[in-house]
Amino acid sequence: MARYFGELFMLDDDVHACKTLYAEKGESGRVKDKDKITRIILSLHEMASLMDIHLFGFTSRISPVMYNETSFLSLSKMITGCSYGIIYNKNTWWNEELRLKEDFWISCYMKYKERRVLTDLRYNFEQKNTFVNAGGLASIRNQEEERRSILFIKKNFGDSILLKSATNNGKDKTKQLVQYNITCKFKY
């Protein structure tokens, strides 16, 4: 798809809200205007294009307390799979053996190949609980497939992939459904 379109932004069908993480206490933080959401996405695409970055997206952080106003953009953080964009080049490649965690794969692969991924830490695209929903990847998403995908990524990227301890990452039910997760730290 990326090779065919060249430049694209993918937004999962289970995304139900765009939120600002820089909202002040008492402010909603929910972005409801579709035109504003489109401008947010296009603005990040333009920044990525100007910086010659081929993978860009938004944070998976969900709480304003996780927001650092002096570091609202990152070149080293991962993107979240529910909302990211590609500006195609020879390095934008997904391993088709991987059925889950493809966002993690492309983040690691682009960080390895190009040493940077543009992540906007000001906005989060919120998803419904996808681990148990019908449709999409629900038919293959289970603990064993998650484990297989994580071990496959670890096999390919080695010591750069670290297993995270059990956490609920601020989301209900995740702790019970996912036994472990991973993070990435390249030594460069």
Predicted regions and their residues:
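Active-site nucleotide-sugar/metal-binding loop of Leloir-type enzymes
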Residues: 1-12
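A generic secondary-structure signal
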Residues: 3, 43-47, 152
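Short, well-ordered alpha-helix to beta-strand connector turns
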Residues: 4-5, 53, 114, 157
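Conserved catalytic core of nucleotide-sugar-dependent glycosyltransferases
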Residues: 9, 15-105, 186
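C-terminal catalytic/acceptor-binding lobe
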Residues: 98-188
